[in-house]
């Protein structure tokens, strides 16, 4: 029955040098599954709780409590379970925690076990993870959202928006898309260098130059796309992550928080108008978190304005949570959900969120966190769940490239069955 023989967690380090949780699950057949848990810098207030130790060690960011919860209470309850009982295992941990946001055991403890169990099960069957989770229909390679300029909380650049991304929507295949993305990334480096700007990279591998503002960042990206020999608005589109919750202050969108005196302060309606203006002026296909996570009226305004022609992605808004997504669907707010496994804390709940989104006609985007590891599970999950899009950083830093490289392997393994959706990944006009 492939029973779980042992569960062992340890403290390792993420791409920012902060502690995180890694879990090994061993079966009675000697098979092992391993998963490392990512961590975010800008986190939604409705996310599942990442348990940290506090105190002086690691500036309060240690995860020994979460590790002890895995090695103690969680292991005590799960030893003897079949690794193929994913739903039962996940539900057992949810019940064991007993809180609505996994604050007792920690979402980082629970997720590490959940993903390691799935990997052990796939290894038991000598099957790739994407095939084990997704079955025979798992054949869609995602269109990459490549974060090439970082702003907001991810860099020291004086720009409020957190991420400026490129999407090679008309590539012939995933490998072709990655070629296009890397060429644009390297051309962007040259464009920045020629302007005497910094080419140091931020948390997610994108550049963090001292640009003059949002439009300067967009114009610079257009120049890099053209310099690489591609057509913006046709072969390559732009995606934004505004992370608006990071500069939503006292009911207004206060750009001065990141942009200083030249930044504007906008109401919800003005913010919606500004996003619509940018979308009409530039080849923007996707905007994530253009409004604060609690500004449902603002979200409704921007959805009504541009939701028919721009993908509007809820990250902090939905936090991979079916209850919040359900409200969004009911009120026709946004049209896409960002999927972050550590926002909700189990594989079962992640799958439920993707299924709910797709059944309602919303798109889904599999996503990394700014604090990542060499773990490439989300690459397999993007294919397994046919999300059609993945957001996993720039074309630099091995913690980001690990996911892209895994997708190259999956595409090669799938062969002729591999499907790259191009612009059909978006359900907009």
From Swiss-Prot:
Binding site for (2R)-2-phosphoglycerate: 162, 340, 369-370, 391
Catalytic reaction annotation: (2R)-2-phosphoglycerate = phosphoenolpyruvate + H2O
GO-annotated cellular components: cell surface; extracellular region; phosphopyruvate hydratase complex
Superkingdom classification of source: Bacteria
MF annotations from Gene Ontology: magnesium ion binding; phosphopyruvate hydratase activity
Keywords, in A-Z order: Cytoplasm, Glycolysis, Lyase, Magnesium, Metal-binding, Secreted
Cofactor(s) the protein requires to work: Mg(2+)
Subcellular compartments: Cytoplasm; Secreted; Cell surface
EC number(s) given by UniProt: 4.2.1.11
Record-linked InterPro entries: Enolase (IPR000941), Enolase-like_C_sf (IPR036849), Enolase-like_N (IPR029017), Enolase_C (IPR020810), Enolase_CS (IPR020809), Enolase_N (IPR020811)
SMART domains per record: Enolase_C (SM01192), Enolase_N (SM01193)
A GO biological process held by the record: glycolytic process
Gene3D superfamilies linked to this entry: Enolase-like C-terminal domain, Enolase-like, N-terminal domain
Note on how the cofactor is bound: Binds a second Mg(2+) ion via substrate during catalysis.
SUPFAM superfamilies given in the database record: Enolase C-terminal domain-like, Enolase N-terminal domain-like
Its biological purpose: Catalyzes the reversible conversion of 2-phosphoglycerate (2-PG) into phosphoenolpyruvate (PEP). It is essential for the degradation of carbohydrates via glycolysis.
Family: Belongs to the enolase family.
NCBIfam families: eno
Listed name of the protein: Enolase
Organism listed in the record: Christiangramia forsetii (strain DSM 17595 / CGMCC 1.15422 / KT0803)
Lineage: Bacteria, Pseudomonadati, Bacteroidota, Flavobacteriia, Flavobacteriales
């Amino acid at each position: 029955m492939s029973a779980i023989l042992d569960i062992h967690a340890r403290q390792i380090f993420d791409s920012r040098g902060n502690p995180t949780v890694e879990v090994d699950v061993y079966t009675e057949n000697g098979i092992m599954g391993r998963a490392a848990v990512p961590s975010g810098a800008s986190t939604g207030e409705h996310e599942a709780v990442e348990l940290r130790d506090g105190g002086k060690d690691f500036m309060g960011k240690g995860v020994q409590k979460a590790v002890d919860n895995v090695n103690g209470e969680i292991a005590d309850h799960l030893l003897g379970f079949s690794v193929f009982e994913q739903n039962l295992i996940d539900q057992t941990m949810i019940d064991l925690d007993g809180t609505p946001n996994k604050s007792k055991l920690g979402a980082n403890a629970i997720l590490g076990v959940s993903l390691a169990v799935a990997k052990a099960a796939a290894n038991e069957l000598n099957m790739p993870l994407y095939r084990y989770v997704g079955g025979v229909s798992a054949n869609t390679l995602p269109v990459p959202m490549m974060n090439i300029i970082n702003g907001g909380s991810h860099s020291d650049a004086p720009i409020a928006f957190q991420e400026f991304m490129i999407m090679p929507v008309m590539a012939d295949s995933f490998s072709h898309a990655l070629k296009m993305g890397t060429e644009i990334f390297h051309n962007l480096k040259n464009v920045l260098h020629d302007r005497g700007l910094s080419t140091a990279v931020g948390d997610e591998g994108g550049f963090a130059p001292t640009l003059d503002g949002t439009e300067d960042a967009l114009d610079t990206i257009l120049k890099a796309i053209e310099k690489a020999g591609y057509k913006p608005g046709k072969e390559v589109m732009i995606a934004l992550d505004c992370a608006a919750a990071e500069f939503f202050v006292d009911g207004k969108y206060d750009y001065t928080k990141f942009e200083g005196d030249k930044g504007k302060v906008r109401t919800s309606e003005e913010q919606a108008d500004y996003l619509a203006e940018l979308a009409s002026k530039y080849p923007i296909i996707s905007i994530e978190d253009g409004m604060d996570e609690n500004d449902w009226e603002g979200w409704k305004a921007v959805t009504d304005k541009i939701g028919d022609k721009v993908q509007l992605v809820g990250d902090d808004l939905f936090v991979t949570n079916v209850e919040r997504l359900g409200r969004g669907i009911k009120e026709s707010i946004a049209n896409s959900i960002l999927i972050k496994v550590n926002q909700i804390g189990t594989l079962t709940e992640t799958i439920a969120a993707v299924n709910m989104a797709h059944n309602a006609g919303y798109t889904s985007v599999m996503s990394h966190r700014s604090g990542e590891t060499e773990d490439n599970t989300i690459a397999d999950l993007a294919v397994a769940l046919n999300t059609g899009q993945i957001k996993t950083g720039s074309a630099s830093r091995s913690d980001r490239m690990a996911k892209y490289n895994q997708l190259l392997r999956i595409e090669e393994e799938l062969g002729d069955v591999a499907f790259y959706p191009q612009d059909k990944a978006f359900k907009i006009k």
